[in-house]
């Protein structure tokens, strides 16, 4: 029989290191956060072999007193909290006193430090958690921590390390986040003698963004701010034309601490509405300042998860801050820049094709423009005026179905089929990207456009006061029709339609338990599920606004929505239907329209709340300014913008 014993402190530290120190990036994070808490204004991070051989952090903070240096390597020794009450008003990044002893237990650690006014500094060397020497030493005010041979005594950890490039990438990401969290501090990251990242430490967040993401990206970010009695929000988000393929470029900070929060990420996307393309994400650097009593940071070993009181109010503030800032912007993409991004420039000399002149003179006789046939016009007019039909998709019951014996229909989750659409739709699993986003669109100014031509039956050309505009006719009418349908889908009839064949829905045990608790929320929107066996629910009637062919996917989606967000909305669910209808009933590509219809479409577009994007986030129009034209024909040269000029933006 084994007996209970108290583990030696060194072994306990190694176990704790398993949670706190996962990889070299964890060492960098913990040591740099200590440097920030020490009041540093300059922090230099030097690494060798992606941190596995060496991590050295040098700061100019307060330092550690000589008689406290050894104490700093003991578990739960800290200067940041004194009693239980301090745990609920944490303003520092660290507070547990675990990082330094955990790092020392799995490495060779050398610490050199000095405080202001001391006659000398202190040098400490520890190997595997055991202190080998503590001696006086010469040192500037501040602290230098050198961590060598990481995981030398835990070879199993080394076995699972990724490539040096992958580990270096994690370190760069950590330093970048810290640089964005604290623009008042100068950060420098040096890997194997090469500087990877540097921030100026001027306190200007836009300059920190420029140092990390580049000057071009910094110029395309707009400032946001909002506040109430509990929260103060500030930061920058990118214009919709500057996006990335994942959420990694969204950085959220609470009281200077980088956090990960799904609901706040969703609030950011909600603020953009449908101005973002599906599957694209903005760059965002958002600082949230709150009373420490409203945030619990002591819920995760890495402190990246934070529980926030009044989270819904905070989400609303974030969304409103972004929506209000975007409302003040002209969101028509610059065509010349888009061309530069999408065109593959061939540097080889291209032989010019000689085109014979049709006439001997430069001018030709004016001819009447070709007109579409009566059939084409009729087809187009049907498409233009077809709105409003079949907004409610009721299943028609046939005599054969009425005479069939009753039975149970076991519902299955089936993938949606969007093969017949022009482009991919939002799937129901990501419905929170749909109506919540689309509902927040604000009216904004739209240029006066004078239509003058069409190309390939797809693009309309118009002239404005400040240049040439090219409009995608399908995307334009899709936006117009979507906004017509948007109000209609919210007017929901709560009447019920009996099902001749009830549906059985089955869920995992944990989901079934939570659904039972939240069933009243489903009933509020007309969905009545009754328990039917273990982890199963039966649906005997459906709300009349839900078409019968939508029942399986629709009920599962609404339940998923309820489990994920603790709320359910008919409008969110039906947003997909509005998007599909607007897509199917809009002018298709390669379809010529007459001048009157084109002008009418441009007028309708100008009346939209958001005339810049279709419901999927694709741009409706692009803009060539007069300056763009002059650049294309080399009439003017582009000026270079320096980092110093960022203050003008």
UniProtKB/Swiss-Prot annotation:
Pfam entry (one): MutL_C
CDD domains, alphabetized: HATPase_MutL-MLH-PMS-like (cd16926), MutL_Trans (cd00782)
Chain segments annotated as transmembrane: none
GO molecular function term, any single one: ATP hydrolysis activity
Substitution effect: residue 62 to Y: In strain: 951
Keyword Cytoplasm: no
PROSITE patterns per the UniProt record, alphabetical: DNA_MISMATCH_REPAIR_1
SUPFAM superfamilies: ATPase domain of HSP90 chaperone/DNA topoisomerase II/histidine kinase, DNA mismatch repair protein MutL, Ribosomal protein S5 domain 2-like
Any one of the GO CC terms: mismatch repair complex
One record GO biological process: mismatch repair
Keywords assigned: DNA damage, DNA repair
DNA damage in keyword set: yes
InterPro entries on file: DNA_mismatch_repair_CS, DNA_mismatch_repair_MutL, DNA_mismatch_S5_2-like, HATPase_C_sf, MutL/Mlh/PMS, MutL/Mlh/Pms-like, MutL_C, MutL_C_dimsub
Family: Belongs to the DNA mismatch repair MutL/HexB family.
NCBIfam families for this protein: mutl, PRK00095.1-3
Function, in words: This protein is involved in the repair of mismatches in DNA. The hex system is nick-directed.
Listed name of the protein: DNA mismatch repair protein HexB
């Amino acid at each position: 029989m084994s007996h209970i014993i108290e583990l030696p402190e060194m072994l306990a530290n190694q176990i704790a290191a398993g949670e706190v120190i996962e990889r070299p990036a964890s060492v960098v994070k913990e040591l740099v956060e200590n440097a920030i808490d020490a009041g540093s204004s300059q922090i230099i991070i030097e690494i060798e072999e992606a941190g596995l051989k060496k991590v050295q952090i040098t700061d100019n903070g307060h330092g550690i007193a000589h008689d406290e240096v050894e104490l700093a390597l003991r578990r739960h020794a800290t200067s940041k909290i004194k009693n239980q009450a301090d745990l609920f008003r944490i303003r520092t990044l660290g507070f547990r006193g675990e990082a330094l002893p955990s790092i020392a237990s799995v490495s060779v650690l050398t610490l050199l430090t000095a405080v202001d006014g001391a006659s000398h500094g202190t040098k400490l060397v520890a190997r595997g958690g055991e202190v080998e020497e503590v001696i006086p030493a010469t040192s500037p005010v501040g602290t230098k921590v050198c961590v060598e041979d990481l995981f030398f005594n835990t070879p199993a950890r080394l076995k699972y390390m990724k490539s040096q490039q992958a580990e270096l990438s994690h370190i760069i990401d950590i330093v970048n986040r810290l640089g964005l969290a604290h623009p008042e501090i100068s950060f420098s990251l040096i890997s194997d003698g090469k500087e990877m990242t540097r921030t100026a430490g001027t306190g200007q967040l836009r300059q920190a963004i420029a140092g990390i993401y580049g000057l071009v990206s910094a110029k395309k970010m707009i400032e946001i701010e909002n506040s109430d009695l509990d929260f103060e929000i500030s930061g920058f988000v990118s214009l919709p034309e500057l996006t990335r393929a994942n959420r990694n470029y969204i950085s959220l900070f609470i009281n200077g601490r980088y956090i990960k929060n799904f609901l706040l990420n969703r609030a950011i996307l909600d603020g953009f509405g449908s101005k973002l393309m599906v599957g694209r994400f903005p760059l965002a650097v958002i600082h949230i300042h709150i009373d420490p009593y409203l945030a619990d940071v002591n819920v995760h070993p890495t402190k990246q998860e934070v529980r926030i009181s009044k989270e819904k109010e905070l989400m609303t503030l974030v969304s409103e801050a972004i929506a209000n800032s975007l409302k003040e912007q002209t969101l028509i993409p610059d065509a010349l820049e888009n061309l530069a991004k999408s065109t593959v420039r061939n540097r080889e000399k291209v032989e010019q094709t000689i085109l014979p002149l049709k006439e001997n003179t430069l001018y030709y006789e004016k001819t009447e423009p070709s007109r579409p046939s009566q059939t084409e016009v009729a087809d187009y007019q049907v498409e233009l005026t077809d709105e409003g039909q079949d907004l409610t998709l009721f299943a028609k019951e046939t005599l054969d179905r009425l005479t069939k014996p009753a039975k149970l229909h076991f519902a299955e989750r089936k993938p949606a089929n969007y093969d017949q659409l022009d482009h991919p739709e939002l799937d129901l699993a990501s419905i929170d990207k749909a109506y919540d986003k689309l509902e927040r669109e604000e009216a904004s100014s739209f240029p006066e456009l004078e239509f003058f031509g069409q190309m390939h039956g797809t693009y309309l050309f118009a002239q404005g006061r400040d240049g040439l505009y090219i409009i995608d006719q399908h995307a334009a009418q899709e936006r117009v029709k979507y906004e017509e349908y948007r109000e209609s889908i919210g007017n929901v009839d709560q009447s019920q339609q009996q099902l001749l064949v009830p549906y059985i829905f089955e869920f995992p045990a944990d989901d079934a338990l939570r659904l039972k608790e939240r069933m009243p929320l489903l009933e509020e929107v007309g969905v009545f599920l009754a328990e039917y066996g273990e982890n199963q629910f039966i649906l005997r009637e459906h709300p009349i606004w839900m078409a019968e062919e939508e029942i399986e996917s629709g009920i599962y989606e609404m339940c998923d929505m309820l489990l994920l967000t603790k709320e359910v909305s008919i409008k969110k669910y039906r947003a997909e239907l509005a998007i599909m209808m607007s897509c199917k009933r809009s002018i298709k590509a390669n379809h010529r329209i007459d001048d009157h219809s084109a002008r009418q479409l441009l007028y309708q577009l100008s009346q939209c709340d958001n005339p810049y994007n279709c419901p999927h986030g694709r741009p409706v129009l692009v803009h060539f300014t007069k300056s763009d034209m002059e650049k294309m024909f080399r009439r003017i040269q582009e000026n270079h913008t320096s980092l110093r000029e960022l203050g003008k933006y």
